[in-house]
Amino acid sequence: MNVHTPRKDEALTVTTGPLPASTKIFTAPEGFPGLKVPFREIALHPSAKEPPVRVYDTSGPYTDPTAQIDLERGLPRTREAWLEARGGTELYEGRDVKPEDNGNVGEKHLARAFPVRNLPRRGLPGHPVTQYEFAKAGIVTAEMAYIAERENMGRKQAAANAAHRIAEGESFGADIPEFITPEFVRDEVAAGRAIIPSNINHPELEPMIIGRNFLVKINANIGNSAVASSVAEEVDKMVWAIRWGADNVMDLSTGRNIHNTREWIIRNSPVPIGTVPIYQALEKVDGIAENLTWEVYRDTLIEQAEQGVDYFTIHAGVRLAYVPLTAKRVTGIVSRGGSIMAKWCLAHHKESFLYTHFEEICDIMRQYDVSFSLGDGLRPGSIADANDEAQFAELETLGELTQIAWAKGCQVMIEGPGHVPMHKIKVNMDKQLKHCGGAPFYTLGPLTTDIAPGYDHITSGIGAAMIGWFGCAMLCYVTPKEHLGLPDRADVKEGVITYKIAAHAADLAKGHPAAQLRDDALSRARFEFRWEDQFNLALDPERAKEFHDRTLPKEAHKVAHFCSMCGPKFCSMKITQEVRDYAESGMADMASEFRNSGGEIYLEEADAAVKASNRALGGKAAE
């Protein structure tokens, strides 16, 4: 089902409705009866004699058939009541939208502003505002209780065999509990090991957590460019990404209408939204990096914080002294934000204003509880440049900035590479933990080889699974279009599914106590030839069914005990089932014979036969 919103120049369309055999359910955490935490339950065929399989759900109201979706009004502002109850914030008029906020685009090409304007909210002096500050004060927020319920999949006690699953895994020092309590969430946030990206101006948000001791999360990038896309396409891509499992979405728009595009996305997003503010700041100075100023950047931070952006990528670790370290690289500086700041540093021959004004940036972000995503502006753009001096010099600076941000009451995660061959991945995780005090790591892949343009979702998915296993908390997806063009709707889905696989593989390897439940359910369905259950339990039910039906399209084939790979005579699972049936039949026959013979364990005739056989084999000694 699609929802349309008329526009003066285009129709805004998003996909709604449940996935196959799926039902949206809600549970409430104990002690917080007003909270409704969403999950998806996948119904199985009655022959399975199993309950529905419950899975984590990022799709928001868009897959709830009872929800009334109105893109013109945005999603319900559920967290507003939580914020009011906590106190410590105020509504205020906010800044006016300026022509430069949308790239000085003329009226003809200006995207329509979001129809509803809500007053922005900011923190009051002397009160905790950020989730980090509440956690440090020993306060369990509604967001923390919501997250505990979400990470536990609504269970009220540890999953069966939880301790065994944890013991089987290799978590490389992570501390994954059998059961997550709100107090555990609070403790992880207070220690800086996890963040809850949740701007107080994004009340439509369904809270989630990013941290090494929780489920591995994934981020999907969307956004227009100077040559492609529109508001409608980007809102559609956001809804499409979360339908398939994106936990977070970054709006990396660099073209016209940046402000209005972002407003439409945030107001209709149930997941955290991140941005790179330097992109919009650059648009405000006509794309000339040397003309950037602290004042322009500061204004951009406030603009985006008032809109509700949940985390900012800020490349404050790109220092003047580090830029020459990239001179001998094969691919130089590949981060857009990093290259912008490097050019500014060289043009002015001084430290970046992101570095020199970092404490002021912290003060702004704390007022709105915008989380830091400290950008790796000097990440390697080829495996030849992996783990070089420039990359790790910046990482050490990010560790120093993390301590400053924590002291200011802000939440922090650290961005990582990039392009790294498999044998060089683990040292990245180890160094990040060492230098950044355990703050969550968030990596782009990494891509493990450079020879596969068009398939970089695969080259990076390999690295993502590995670094997720080693302790990376969030994986930024890579699509097949990486290095080639702006991703479209199909690319977004391909990237999200690839990274859901990587994140889930990491959860399994770490020994997450409930990660294997879905795998086991699908394996049972596969062995029992419950084809529809196999499709429905898959990350992409549509593709699974499509591939099956290309060669066996009839409904009768949905109950067949074979697929087109092996056919009816060579299906290993069918043969195995026949062997089992034969063995069970044979055991039943033997049991019947035993009972018919009187139930004696030793029979005289049999005993005599055994002795005769033993004599033939080796005389009386064999007896």
Swiss-Prot record:
Q: Which reaction does it catalyse?
A: 5-amino-1-(5-phospho-beta-D-ribosyl)imidazole + S-adenosyl-L-methionine = 4-amino-2-methyl-5-(phosphooxymethyl)pyrimidine + CO + 5'-deoxyadenosine + formate + L-methionine + 3 H(+)
Cofactor binding, per record: Binds 1 [4Fe-4S] cluster per subunit. The cluster is coordinated with 3 cysteines and an exchangeable S-adenosyl-L-methionine.
Q: Kindly indicate whether the keyword 4Fe-4S belongs to this entry.
A: yes
Q: Which is one Pfam family of this protein?
A: ThiC_Rad_SAM
Query: Where [4Fe-4S] cluster is bound, by residue?
Result: C563, C566, C571
Q: What is this protein called?
A: Phosphomethylpyrimidine synthase
Oligomer and partners: Homodimer.
Superkingdom assignment = Bacteria
GO-annotated cellular components: cytosol
Give one GO biological process term. thiamine diphosphate biosynthetic process
Q: Which UniProt keywords apply?
A: 4Fe-4S, Iron, Iron-sulfur, Lyase, Metal-binding, S-adenosyl-L-methionine, Thiamine biosynthesis, Zinc
* InterPro entries on file: ThiC, ThiC-associated_dom, ThiC/Bza_core_dom, ThiC/BzaA/B
Q: What class of enzyme is it?
A: lyase
Gene Ontology MF terms in the entry = 4 iron, 4 sulfur cluster binding; carbon-carbon lyase activity; zinc ion binding
Where Zn(2+) binds, per the record, is at H419, H483
Functionally, this protein is described as follows: Catalyzes the synthesis of the hydroxymethylpyrimidine phosphate (HMP-P) moiety of thiamine from aminoimidazole ribotide (AIR) in a radical S-adenosyl-L-methionine (SAM)-dependent reaction.
Q: Which cofactors go with this protein?
A: [4Fe-4S] cluster
Biological pathway: Cofactor biosynthesis; thiamine diphosphate biosynthesis
Q: Where does substrate bind?
A: N221, M250, Y279, H315, S335, R336, G337, D376, G377, L378, R379, E415, Y442
* Encoding gene (name): thiC
Which family does the record assign?
Answer: Belongs to the ThiC family.
List its EC numbers.
4.1.99.17
